[in-house]
Amino acid sequence: DYHIERNVTIDAQKDKVFDYIKYLKNQDNYSFWNKQDPEMTKNYTGNDGEVGFVSSWVGNDKVGTGEQEIIGIKEGDRLDLELRFKKPYKMSNSAYMTTDAVSENQTKVTWAFDGKMNYPMNVMMPIINMDKMLGDQLQAGLNDLKIILEKIQTEKRVEPSVPVDSANTIN
């Protein structure tokens, strides 16, 4: 059995961060694994951001075949997922993402995986440093999430340009 988690602090409000991560389709923008196969085929069932939504994929040897399902949402706080891998190995893991306010405009996001390795992969556990391997991949995704959300936050802070009133222009 293993538990792996990583976190990052994002300069954005908690509700905005959660509203982004609860939609699994947004993982296309920040998940390490999505970047491993740009040609990956994706299918979706249900309403994204709601319990029961399933995102499935068929990818290359790096990402394999599987699906993830939203199995729980504590609105604004926690997203629970079940990952079901089909290829190259059949296994099921749980994952979650949480958001915690650090301050009014800062949010700590934690992304964690819990799993169990079955034979023959469990034989490799003493050799494979799952925490480092999977943890580095989680951290890469979180770092990209931070960049995306801070960019969105910055763009929203920009004051809209004031339209020129044509009645006051000199012709």
Model feature map: region roles:
Residues K22-N29, G72-R78, N143-T154:
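Sec-exported extracytoplasmic/periplasmic mature domains
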Residues G46, V51-F53, V58-Q106:
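Hydrophobic-ligand binding "helix-grip"
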Residues D1-G46:
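Hydrophobic ligand-binding cavity/cleft-lining segments
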Residues K14, F18-Q27, E67, Y96, ...:
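Extracytoplasmic/secreted envelope proteins and their assembly/folding machinery
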Residues K42-N43, K146-I170:
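Short, highly charged C-terminal tails/helix-capping segments
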Residues E82-Q139, L145-I147:
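Beta-strand/loop substructures that line and gate deep hydrophobic ligand-binding cavities in soluble
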Residues I10, K14, Y20, V63-G64, ...:
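Solvent-exposed, acidic/flexible segments
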